[in-house]
Amino acid sequence: MSTKKYIQNREGLPNWSNPISHAVVANNMCFVSGQLSVNRKGEFVLGSILEETERAFGNFFAVIEKSGFTKEDIVFIDIAFNDLKDQPIVDQLYSEYFEENKRPARTVYQVESLPFGGKIKIMGTAVKDKLELLQERT
């Protein structure tokens, strides 16, 4: 049987005013909605690609943690840019955030525009070992 947990507007996460969940946890998987350069009040913060990427990844990692997962559980990341010329900067941060031989699968692509005029959006999936989940529930 599938159990679902909806992660919405928890302390330490951006306070979204739109009707979405930060993440949905189903069984041993966590599906994280697109994270932007948004502060904890839910206000978009424009900046350089480096600043926006750090903030978006910070939000992404916070959602993962509030969902009961860790960075090591992340198996897939989807990154949308408004300009692929920014990819080398994001690649550098990505290599700092994830160990060389344990990096999640990833897609990157360019979109025409992102909400609030942002430069990047990050979403992804994390998976816990079922044995690990069983141990947490007992």
Predicted regions and their residues:
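N-terminal presequence-like segments and the immediate start of the first folded domain
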Residues: 1-58, 62-75, 81-138
